[in-house]
Amino acid sequence: MASLPSSARCVIIGAGIVGNSLAYHLAELGWTDIVQLDKGPLPNPGGSTGHASNFIFPVDHSREFADITLDSVRQYKELGVFTESGGYEVARTEERMEELRRRMSSAKAWGIPAELVTPEQVVEKVPFLDPSVIIGAAWFPT
């Protein structure tokens, strides 16, 4: 562990997605006197970011959120830390399936690659899922 300085221009508490993003963007703006603290050792200090799936769904309810997400993907690619693995959002209720249909309409309108798939298509890639409890899914290649 690095020793802590007695003072800093900026002290960031947390090394999760928000803290790391803040440190990155401040450094991009030319800040150099930054200290970042977290409760545990990196790369997984034990906070909520480390418990997340780390999958990026590029289509949300607004174009603004979709644009922010796509910009995040661009930044991760530039940093060389992005793995394009693809993923499913699975619907087990008709209400959830209707939400996925709305998001697919947005994806198509915004030019974002995504598609609705059948339970059988999901199980081809994720064989431990029970297709009898899935109505359908959205596939995102990012």
PLM regions and their residue ranges:
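Hydrophobic alpha-helical packing residues
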Residues: 26-27, 107
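Dinucleotide-binding Rossmann-like beta1-alpha1 core, especially the glycine-rich loop
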Residues: 52-126
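Glycine-rich FAD pyrophosphate-binding loop
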Residues: 27-49
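Beta1/beta-strand and adjacent pyrophosphate-binding region of the FAD-binding site
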Residues: 2-18, 35
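Glycine-rich "substrate-gating" loop/helix at the edge of Rossmann-like oxidoreductase active sites
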Residues: 140-142
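Short, flexible, mixed-charge acidic loops at enzyme active sites
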Residues: 46-53, 129-130
